[in-house]
């Protein structure tokens, strides 16, 4: 039911999502599912929604489950993550750089979707590679993240 709601175009969609949040905001597992389901949305505005969710008061990169629920799920959203503009790649790279400062192991485990650049058309592949290179060039990057991002460029 939540997936149908998230992917739908009902004029009551936003109110229903807000009501769902209000009802379950104290339940971490359900809230992780709420973030994850929205990150996997097939709607045209999924990338915008995920960016907004990253600023939500209950989203924190300090919680590995929450980070995986939003960032990990979004990075396997074929439509939104691979938007031709590169917006999804930029967003994930930004989040991974921030997450690396808090939890290098979790950040490194979320790199592989960017590393699949060889499977995509030249324009998308170039954007994915550019984000991996930007990650690698980040000052103070952890060893885990550096190794995973470097390996992903090969």
Regions found by a protein language model. Give the residues of each.
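Long, ordered, helix-rich scaffold segments
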Residues: 1-154
């Amino acid at each position: 039911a939540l997936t149908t709601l998230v992917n739908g175009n009902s004029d009551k969609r936003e109110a229903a999502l807000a009501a769902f949040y209000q009802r379950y905001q104290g339940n971490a597992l359900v809230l992780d599912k709420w973030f994850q389901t929205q990150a996997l949305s097939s709607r045209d505005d999924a990338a915008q929604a995920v960016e907004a969710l990253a600023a939500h008061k209950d989203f924190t990169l300090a919680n590995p489950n929450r980070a995986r629920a939003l960032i990990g799920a979004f990075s396997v959203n074929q439509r939104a993550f691979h938007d031709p503009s590169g917006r999804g790649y930029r967003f994930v790279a930004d989040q991974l750089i921030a997450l690396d400062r808090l939890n290098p192991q979790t950040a490194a485990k979320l790199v592989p979707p960017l590393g699949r650049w060889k499977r995509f058309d030249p324009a998308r592949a170039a954007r994915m590679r550019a984000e991996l290179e930007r990650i690698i060039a980040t000052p103070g990057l952890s060893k885990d993240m550096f190794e995973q991002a470097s390996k992903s460029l090969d």
